[in-house]
Amino acid sequence: ASKLSGNSYPSSSAEPVADALVLVDIVPKLSLEGASKVRGFMGSAPDGFASLEEAADAISAYYPDRPRPKDLSGLNKNLRQGDDGRWRWHWDPRWMESPRGNPHLLLDMMDAADWTDRVPTLLVRGMKSDIVDDDGVEDLRRRVPQLEIADIRGAGHMVAGDKNDEFNAAVIEFLTRVMPPAG
């Protein structure tokens, strides 16, 4: 999953912002319904989880069409164990309540950005994502003329975790093409 914030989207710069940009299932114009659903899920355990098993149960309830993994070690990428022994998301859902999480601010920043026509940009989209829909993709395409899109079938918002091989292949192909290795 990705975050898009004021710190990661400078509006203008005399120098190139970056040689390339990869957005992982994030667009400035989010599906508000989907974002609300994700926010509700992420905020449903404000005190964290007593165990990885409890977290896996919550994730399985949110994604009923996915098989519950037998090996829960992958959850270590998304959860952190606190001093109290409870497991909490590494991403703080309160971020969406901050000014930087305001979707209107993100759209305004994109409108003011001057790099969008010169920085090669790839959107890696999970086709089962709750927060990136066709409207958001088309809005981003209008704002970033050279936008490339890698649609990852069967992946939700956590694209890299859902379909890691396809995610890696899309990102590596894009970066190798737009930023070929030297020598």
Regions found by a protein language model. Give the residues of each.
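Conserved serine/cysteine hydrolase catalytic core
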Residues: 81-143, 148-151
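Conserved alpha/beta-hydrolase catalytic His-Asp/Glu region
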Residues: 48-107
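Active-site loop/turn elements of alpha/beta-hydrolase fold enzymes
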Residues: 23-26, 128, 152-154
